[in-house]
């Protein structure tokens, strides 16, 4: 599509034809007036009445109107002809005459001067009419000029050559219809003579032949005159003629009639578009300027899908329908080369005098003679004005460059001569020391680079003169452009260079282009000397999807100082307010320390810029865009990639790095050596180091990479500048993040020896302002001798929730305490107790095993959906960005907030079919933790405390992944980054606002305190602990507050608050049961030390590693039945509540033991396994057993290897099998714990409901006595011969679990006294950990609180968690010594949900037991499980026989009356103790093995 848009009211729409017949006497009845000899169009005068009345003498068709302009008469174009020629044409017609006329308007009236002084687009009807007028004028008139005749020109035929005075006199007399200047010479078109020169007019046939194409009788005009005629083009035919003001020339200062005659045709030798002095000229008038065109030349049709249109002011522009863009530039002229300024000569290259007025102006320039401002020059391409002739200016600059080059060559010759003299002198005096001459600057092998030191950047149009590395690349244009921005080209003698690369753009992905590269050629077209706009338009003209071949030259700095504030005028559309940098290893200019003699010259570079800021401001005042145009198609918010070259000095690179607060890698923390780091800015994100991507590397890995660089070597950094700020609560805005490593340790790169360690005492010596590199000298050594951080710690930390600390500088991070506080406050992390959140998009490719994570939550309306367990080595784990506990916001763009769990599963299934998924997750950014004085720095920090050497043995655990390393929290290992969790735990955040406070709660005699404590243990990675490692440093929190309770009435407790101490005793490292004991011993008043937490991680968000217990009972301070083994083997020391980190002990290490099997086994029992989402721990040590006698093993130690096989992801049954199959010996590799064994929450078992841990309800220490599966199935040595999976199938062999089968003879008895029931899944552990026992008084008090009846699923979840409460465990301990009646009341049959038949059997059994204590013992599962001696005393056959006989007798002897009475009595008890709902069988109920 190539067309010109015109408005309907253009004069061409009013043109009409009229045929007028002559009258009987031959009269026509039409009077013609005007004519070119009067400076007018021929127009209609008086019209005869007969013609107007339409009588026989009238005409046919539309009538002629008086005053209408005559354009054609009998097919002859008469515009510009004198009146006598028009009358001659009319007289030649015999009967009828056909006229083509148009009514006069504001633009087209009878004044020829007015119409000729306007400028129109070539090819438009107005332009064609102008050409017709000129052609007709030249038939009778000869143009005149003030320039001298040239060879071959005939005066009076080609031109009338006049002096300037004669020309001005002629103009003043009104003889000239057109007046203009070209190259300083006046040109004019006079009126035709009022009478024919020879007395004869031109015949109609002659006019027809001339207008049909033959122009032999028309004098051939020279190039200058044709260019003068075609110079200025104004696009006004689309305007309403009555509203358009007249457009006058600026040739004269008069505002009268003579001003109308002056012309602006001055300008461009080359074109049909461009220059007039009127301010409406626009860039569309500048492009057909590249090649000289005659008046008859035609640029041809527009390209396909291009369209020509006009603005309201008549300015032409072009529409590209391919890209839906508009341009001022004619696409037909883009590839035409512009003539350089210094090569311009005067008109036709002939000089008569060396005058400015005789110099040829370059394309796009115009000379204006103004009576007020004098003579000045307008650059219509770049929209600027200047007083100096641009040609003379360019020539002077060229001469200056040549002089500079000559001077430089002379200097080089002198230097070479001096060098030769030096060599000769050295040869003659070889025995002497070298002379002082080497102090003289050596010869420079690259003279081009020394040009800027002379005050002018080097420039050349010859690619062979470039000194540097040539790079060839091919880029394909995307929908966003080529992905780079360009600076330079403000002047024709300025390089066009790469300013920056757009992230993920074609240029950045190609990897060859760098900042500062000079663009030499585009598609084999040399662009050296092209203006900025020209090159940009070349790139823009390339269609999307097409490729472009680029030749670049590397080795020239950008032509401005990046520190110069004036350079902000040269900005990029794509990258807002970004300062270009000087890169590519230009140490000659970058390092004033080593080149101090050149500093002044370098700094003076900005003063030598050919374009002053005023010029740039002038450009923008004309309405042009900034000089730097984006090639990225307006990516306004994208960051930019910048290449920086830095040479490592004696003190390092001169900058420090730290983890990015928003994740994604390492950022430049501080610039220490500004001259060395020129081009680098604080806050830059390091993307690549020496072409290697480091975004996915940890802090220490990046540091090690920089440390390994030798001194004096050059490092190429690709940094990302700009983009999005530190995330707060804004929506997802981090598409550029690669990894969310959120520890905020920082690292000094200014000294490679200070990279390793720094003690906290030294950290306070760092100055708050920019310190010199020497200030870090005290930190260069580590008293521990550790040179590099433990890689296992780094790996484990990067895979755990512990690193979720975006703004947590370690004490040794190089900042003083005050600095850290200011740093936190500056990011608003210390201003409010409620942490901010950060959203992140994570794209995952599906593996064969799936995406590698689990989904939790969404089971109730409004319940959030969270990321659960991350499958090791799965897709999510490999990617490294997704974390357990992240809240799921969107799945493939579909919001899932408030949606159901099922919907998310469906979305993930759809994503699985596609093979990839895009997740939007939200995680908490920070959790403020109080700063401790003796805090040990986190190993995630770049500095390590000298008093806490990390165990190198821990490297052996690298394959174990994050699972086992996370369990070191309770053992105080240095591998954790928790706070106060052990010797290695370091505080991450300093807060001046969030401080702990004491809460005192008083309860009545008959009520509990009314709050639920939730403890996080073992696996914070699998939970939803949004507070990062707060769950490790402060594992105990408020999970629920009972409405109306003392805790609720005090008003100071909130769900999510972390508990630091109970009654002044720190509970950071205490087990859940110890805390319960402390509260029970407190009596009616308890004092809690609290730090504000968050309500999002409350009891409804319990994790796989959390257990809960309700402190709502009316218990007394008395406590009974504690387990001696647990207390006597605890190695840990309780820390004081000053919240100092517990000191590291010598036991916090790894060790190996070999045990030989004794008479009763190896003498220890296990807890945990993969099926329970736990690691394996030592649960008990048998008295005087092999494990106890070895002296190394302790309760709570984590088992890492069994007989050389790692326990990572090992099932409990597999561990048993390994130990059994090992023969008489077993070799264990263990990790020292703190004496406490992590509790297991059965509700988190993967065999439970799909809801996972989110479905765990509150568990109160109420009357629900029915026990759930034990995690501690401790087998005697003589029963180890059973199947390794026998504990899973034990319920199938249980006689009590089935009413149809009698007891099996091979039933397994455990120390816990479990009797498995398939119908209920309940296993009755009798011997349990001390925290599992309860006293009777606490149980009765809990019954008064009246737990509500739950559904079977809820009750099943609740009872699993209930067995973790201290009261229940104590109750089991006391069952050994209570009376048969008490045991009878706790019979599991009484706790069942009572259907009549079930209650009937339970009642009959109860009556039979009352009749016979001996049988009562035989029928009690508790008694059977108490000890192996009793199990041996009663054979399975005897127990089976007795139970069957008793059941038969009970069925026969029972009476309905007695049964109903007993049922009523049972119902009365049920009102006090609600019956338990029947549960489904629970698999793998026994997971602990006594070995």
Curated annotation (Swiss-Prot):
Recorded GO cellular component terms are:
adherens junction; bicellular tight junction; cell junction; cell periphery; cell projection; cell-cell junction; cytoplasm; nucleolus
Its chief place of residence is other
Question: Where is there biased composition of kind Polar residues?
Answer: 586-600, 756-766, 939-951, 1112-1130
Instruction: State the tissue distribution.
Output: Widely expressed with the exception of skeletal muscle. Isoform 1, isoform 2 and isoform 6 are highly expressed in colon, kidney, lung, liver, and pancreas. Isoform 5 is predominantly expressed in brain and heart. Isoform 3 and isoform 4 are highly expressed in pancreas and brain.
Q: Which regions are flagged for Pro residues bias?
A: 435-445
Q: What are its GO biological-process terms?
A: cell adhesion; cell surface receptor signaling pathway; endothelial cell morphogenesis; positive regulation of cell-cell adhesion; protein-containing complex assembly; signal transduction
> What GO annotations for molecular function exist for this entry?
alpha-actinin binding; ATP binding
Where found?
Cell junction, Tight junction; Cell membrane
Record region (Disordered): 236-267, 411-462, 586-623, 720-832, 932-987, 1112-1143, 1234-1491
Q: Where is the WW domain?
A: 300-333, 359-392
- PDZ domain location, by residue? 17-105, 472-554, 643-721, 813-895, 970-1066, 1124-1206
The topology of this chain with respect to the membrane is: Peripheral membrane protein
What residues bind ATP, as annotated?
103-110
Gly residues: bias regions: 975-987
Stretches for region Interaction with FCHSD2:
970-1066
Which residues lie in Low complexity bias regions?
411-421, 742-752
Phosphoserine: modified positions: 357, 730, 741, 800, 1071, 1361, 1412
Pinpoint the Guanylate kinase-like domain residues: 96-287
| UniProt biased composition (Basic and acidic residues) | 1278-1338, 1354-1396, 1403-1491
Q: Which Gene3D superfamilies match?
A: 2.20.70.10, 2.30.42.10, Guanylate Kinase phosphate binding domain
Q: What InterPro entries does the entry give? A: GK/Ca_channel_bsu, Guanylate_kin-like_dom, Guanylate_kinase_CS, P-loop_NTPase, PDZ, PDZ_sf, WW_dom, WW_dom_sf
Q: Where are the transmembrane segments?
A: none
What's this chain's function? Plays a role in coupling actin fibers to cell junctions in endothelial cells, via its interaction with AMOTL2 and CDH5. May regulate acid-induced ASIC3 currents by modulating its expression at the cell surface.
Q: How does it assemble?
A: Part of a complex composed of AMOTL2, MAGI1 and CDH5, within the complex AMOTL2 acts as a scaffold protein for the interaction of MAGI1 with CDH5. The complex is required for coupling actin fibers to cell junctions in endothelial cells. Interacts through its WW 2 domain with SYNPO and through its PDZ 5 domain with ACTN4. Interacts with cytoplasmic domain of ADGRB1. Interacts via its WW domains with DRPLA. Interacts with ESAM, LRP2 and CXADR. May interact with CTNNB1. Interacts through its PDZ 1 domain with NET1. Interacts with ASIC3 and AMOT. Interacts with FCHSD2.
- Could you tell me what this protein is called? Membrane-associated guanylate kinase, WW and PDZ domain-containing protein 1
């Amino acid at each position: 599509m190539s067309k010109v848009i015109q408005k309907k009211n253009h004069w061409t729409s009013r043109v009409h034809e009229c045929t007028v017949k002559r009258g009987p006497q031959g009269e026509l009845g039409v009077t013609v007036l005007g004519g070119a000899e009067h400076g007018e169009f021929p127009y209609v005068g008086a019209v005869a009445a007969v013609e107007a009345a339409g009588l026989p003498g009238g005409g046919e068709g539309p009538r002629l109107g008086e005053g209408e302009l005559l354009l054609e008469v009998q097919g002859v174009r008469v515009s510009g002809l004198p009146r006598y020629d028009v009358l001659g044409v009319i007289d030649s017609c015999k009967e009828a005459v056909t006229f083509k006329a148009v009514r006069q308007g504001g633009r087209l009236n009878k004044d020829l001067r007015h119409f000729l002084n306007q400028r129109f687009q070539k090819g438009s009807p107005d332009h064609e009419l102008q050409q017709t007028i000129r052609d007709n004028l030249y038939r009778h008139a000869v143009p005149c000029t003030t320039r001298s005749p040239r060879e071959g020109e005939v005066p009076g035929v080609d031109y009338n050559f006049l002096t300037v005075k004669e020309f001005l006199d002629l103009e003043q007399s009104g003889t000239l219809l057109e007046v203009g200047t070209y190259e300083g010479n006046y040109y004019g078109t006079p009126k035709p003579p009022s009478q024919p020169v020879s007395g004869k007019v031109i015949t109609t046939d002659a006019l027809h032949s001339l207008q049909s194409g033959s122009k032999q009788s028309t004098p051939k005009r020279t190039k200058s005159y044709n260019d003068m005629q075609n110079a200025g083009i104004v696009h006004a035919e689309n305007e309403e003629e009555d509203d358009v003001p007249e457009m006058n020339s600026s040739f004269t200062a008069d505002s009268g009639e003579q001003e109308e005659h002056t012309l602006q045709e001055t300008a461009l030798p080359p074109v049909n578009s461009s220059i007039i002095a009127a301010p409406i000229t626009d860039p569309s008038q500048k492009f057909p300027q590249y090649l000289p065109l005659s008046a008859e030349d035609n640029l041809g049709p527009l390209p396909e899908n291009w369209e020509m249109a006009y603005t309201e002011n008549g300015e032409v522009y072009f529409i590209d329908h391919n890209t839906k863009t508009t341009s001022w530039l004619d696409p037909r002229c883009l590839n035409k080369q512009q003539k350089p300024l210094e090569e311009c000569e005067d008109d036709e290259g002939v000089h008569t005098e060396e005058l400015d007025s005789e110099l040829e102006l370059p394309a796009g320039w115009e000379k204006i003679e103004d009576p007020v401002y004098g003579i000045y020059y307008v650059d219509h391409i770049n929209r600027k004005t200047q007083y100096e002739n641009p040609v003379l200016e360019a020539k002077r600059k060229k001469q200056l460059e040549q002089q500079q080059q000559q001077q430089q060559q002379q200097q080089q010759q002198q230097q070479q001569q001096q060098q030769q003299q030096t060599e000769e002198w050295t040869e003659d005096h070889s025995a002497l020391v070298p002379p002082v001459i080497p102090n003289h600057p050596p010869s420079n092998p690259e003279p081009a680079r020394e040009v800027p030191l002379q005050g002018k950047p080097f420039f050349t149009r010859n690619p062979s003169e470039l000194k540097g590395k040539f790079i060839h690349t091919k880029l394909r244009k995307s929908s966003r452009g080529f992905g780079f921005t360009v600076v330079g080209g403000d002047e024709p003698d300025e390089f066009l260079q790469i300013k920056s690369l757009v992230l993920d753009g074609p240029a950045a992905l190609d990897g060859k282009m760098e900042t500062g590269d000079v663009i030499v050629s585009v598609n084999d077209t040399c662009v050296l000397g092209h203006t900025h706009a020209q090159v940009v338009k070349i790139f823009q003209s390339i269609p999307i999807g097409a490729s472009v071949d680029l030749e670049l030259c590397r080795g020239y700095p950008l032509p401005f100082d990046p520190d110069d504030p004036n350079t902000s005028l040269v900005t990029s559309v794509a990258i807002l307010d970004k300062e270009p940098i000087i890169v590519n290893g230009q140490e000659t200019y970058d390092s004033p320390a080593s080149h101090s003699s050149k500093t002044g010259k370098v700094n003076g570079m900005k003063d030598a810029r050919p374009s002053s800021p005023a010029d740039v401001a002038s450009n923008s005042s004309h309405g042009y865009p900034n000089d730097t145009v984006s090639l990225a198609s307006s990516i306004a918010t994208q960051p930019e990639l910048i290449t920086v070259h830095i040479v490592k000095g004696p003190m390092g690179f001169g900058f420090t790095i730290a983890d990015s607060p928003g994740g994604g890698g390492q950022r430049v923390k501080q610039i220490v050596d500004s001259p060395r780091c020129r081009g680098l800015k604080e806050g830059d994100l390091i993307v690549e180091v020496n072409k290697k991507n480091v975004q996915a590397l940890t802090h220490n890995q990046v540091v090690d990479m920089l440390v390994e660089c030798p001194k004096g070597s050059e490092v190429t950094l690709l940094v990302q500048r700009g983009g999005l700020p530190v995330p707060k609560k804004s929506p997802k805005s981090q598409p550029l993040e690669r990894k969310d490593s959120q520890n905020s340790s920082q690292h000094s790169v200014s000294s490679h020896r200070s990279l390793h360690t720094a003690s906290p005492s030294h950290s306070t010596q760092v100055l708050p302002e920019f310190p010199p590199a020497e200030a870090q000298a005290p930190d260069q050594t580590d008293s521990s001798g550790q040179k590099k951080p433990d890689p296992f710690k780094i790996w484990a930390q990067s895979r755990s929730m512990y690193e979720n600390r975006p703004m947590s500088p370690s004490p040794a991070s190089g900042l003083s305490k005050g600095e850290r506080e200011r740093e936190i406050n500056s990011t608003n992390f210390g201003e409010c107790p409620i942490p901010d959140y950060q959203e992140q998009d994570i794209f995952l490719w599906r593996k064969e095993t799936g995406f590698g994570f689990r989904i939790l939550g969404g089971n109730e309306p409004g319940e959030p959906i969270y990321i659960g367990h991350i499958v090791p080595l799965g897709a999510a784990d490999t990617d490294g960005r997704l974390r357990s506990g992240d809240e799921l916001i969107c799945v493939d763009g579909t919001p899932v907030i408030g949606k159901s769990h099922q919907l998310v599963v469906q979305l993930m299934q759809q994503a699985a079919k596609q093979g990839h998924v895009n997740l939007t997750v939200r995680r908490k950014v920070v959790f403020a933790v109080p700063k401790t004085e003796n805090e040990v720095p986190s190993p995630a920090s770049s500095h390590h405390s000298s008093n806490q050497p990390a165990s190198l043995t821990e490297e052996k655990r690298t394959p174990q992944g994050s699972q086992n390393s996370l369990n070191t929290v309770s053992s105080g290992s240095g591998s954790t980054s928790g706070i106060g969790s052990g010797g290695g735990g370091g505080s991450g955040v300093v807060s001046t606002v969030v401080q702990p406070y004491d809460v005192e709660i008083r309860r009545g005699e008959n009520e509990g305190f009314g709050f639920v404590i939730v403890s996080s243990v073992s696996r914070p990675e699998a939970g939803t602990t949004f507070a990062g490692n707060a769950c490790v440093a402060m594992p105990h929190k408020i999970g629920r507050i009972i409405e109306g309770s003392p805790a609720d009435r005090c008003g100071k407790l909130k769900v999510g608050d972390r508990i630091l101490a109970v009654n002044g005793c720190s509970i950071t490292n205490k087990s859940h049961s110890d805390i319960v004991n402390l509260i029970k011993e407190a009596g009616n008043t308890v004092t809690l030390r609290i730090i504000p937490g968050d309500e999002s991680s409350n009891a409804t968000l319990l994790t796989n590693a959390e257990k809960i217990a309700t402190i709502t009972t009316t218990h007394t301070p008395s406590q009974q039945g504690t387990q001696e083994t647990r207390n006597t083997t605890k190695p840990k020391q309780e820390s004081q509540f000053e919240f100092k980190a517990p000191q590291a002990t010598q036991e916090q290490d790894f060790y190996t033991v070999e045990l030989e099997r004794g008479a009763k086994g190896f003498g220890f029992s296990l807890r945990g396994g993969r099926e329970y989402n736990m690691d394996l721990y030592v649960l008990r040590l048998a008295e005087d057993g092999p494990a106890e006698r070895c002296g190394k093993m302790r309760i709570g130690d984590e088992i890492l290897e069994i007989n050389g096989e790692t326990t990572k992801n090992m099932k409990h049954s597999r561990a048993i099998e390994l130990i059994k199959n090992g023969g008489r010996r077993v070799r264990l590799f263990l990790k020292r714990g703190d004496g406490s064994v992590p509790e297991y929450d059965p509700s988190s078992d993967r065999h439970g409901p799909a809801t996972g841990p989110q479905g765990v309800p509150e568990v109160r220490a109420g009357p629900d006595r029915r026990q759930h599966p034990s995690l501690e199935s401790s087998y005697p040595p003589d029963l180890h011969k059973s199947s390794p999976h026998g504990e899973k199938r034990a319920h199938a062999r249980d006689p009590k679990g089935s009413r149809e089968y009698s007891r099996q003879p091979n039933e397994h008895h455990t120390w816990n006294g479990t009797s498995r029931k398939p119908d209920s899944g309940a296993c009755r552990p009798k011997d349990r950990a001390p925290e599992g026992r309860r006293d009777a008084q606490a149980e009765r008090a809990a019954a008064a609180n009246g737990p509500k009846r739950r559904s079977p699923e809820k009750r099943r979840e609740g009872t699993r968690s209930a067995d973790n409460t201290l009261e229940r465990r104590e109750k089991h301990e006391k069952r050994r010594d209570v009376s048969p009646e008490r045991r009878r009341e706790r019979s599991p049959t009484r706790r069942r949900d009572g259907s009549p038949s079930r209650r009937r059997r339970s009642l009959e059994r109860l009556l039979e037991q009352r009749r016979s204590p001996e049988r009562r013992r035989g029928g009690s599962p508790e008694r059977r499980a108490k000890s192996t001696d009793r199990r041996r005393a009663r054979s399975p056959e005897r127990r089976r026989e007795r139970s069957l006989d008793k059941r038969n007798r009970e069925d026969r002897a029972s009476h309905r009356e007695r049964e109903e009475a007993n049922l009523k009595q049972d119902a009365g008890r049920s009102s006090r103790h609600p019956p338990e709902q029947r549960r489904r069988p629970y698999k793998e109920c026994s997971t602990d093995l006594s070995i």
